[in-house]
């Protein structure tokens, strides 16, 4: 298959399927209703019950039907106090759920900076390879234009040049899955300033500069050219 056709197929696939928010599976109403024990306590942010249950022998990393731990549930429901308590009691801050998401990526996709900081402070790693796309929280955040999340992950040592299984870096995703607006520009700018490689091309051989020019993203083009992009 010619490279241009391959590239077009990959782009169509990514635009349809590579949405981290869509790929993630938060608990639905029926699951919340069925939760007991630590999952239920995490969902309602009940740190007191969490501590009591764990001290009475509950498995702190017990899984639900989608392999979510109570900590995953706390992250999805933005229950910061529950997440803090779970990690303090030994919950695995880097556990992956059934869709291969950790709490760092869950918080990043939700643009939940407080939960992200809680996750990182509790031992979550910005270096984890997550999602069905073999990506990172940084790639997901750049794709979605979550600029403060991007800056937080960079400060936490996220890999700047990781390439996911679509052939894209965080820098590329900020362009090809972005809208060229203020927040996506801020993501790209933060990545460039942090030292991301501005010349890693996609699978078709198109560089970030080429991709930005194709889309008419003039601010991104200017940032890339100033950084020596080709």
What is each stretch, according to the model?
Residues 60, 93, 126-127, 160, ...:
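Ankyrin-repeat inter-repeat connecting loop/turn
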Residues 23-56, 65-68, 84, 88, ...:
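Intrinsically disordered, low-complexity regulatory segments in ankyrin-centric signaling systems
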Residues 31, 64, 97, 130-131, ...:
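Ankyrin repeat boundary/linker residues
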Residues 46-54, 79-87, 112-121, 146-154, ...:
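Ankyrin repeat structural motif
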Residues 34, 67, 100, 133-134, ...:
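Start-of-repeat signature of ankyrin repeats
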Residues 8-18:
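Bacterial N-terminal signal peptides
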Residues 199-230:
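Leucine-rich solenoid repeat scaffolds
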Residues 40-45, 73-79, 106-112, 140-146, ...:
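Ankyrin repeat A-helix N-terminal signature
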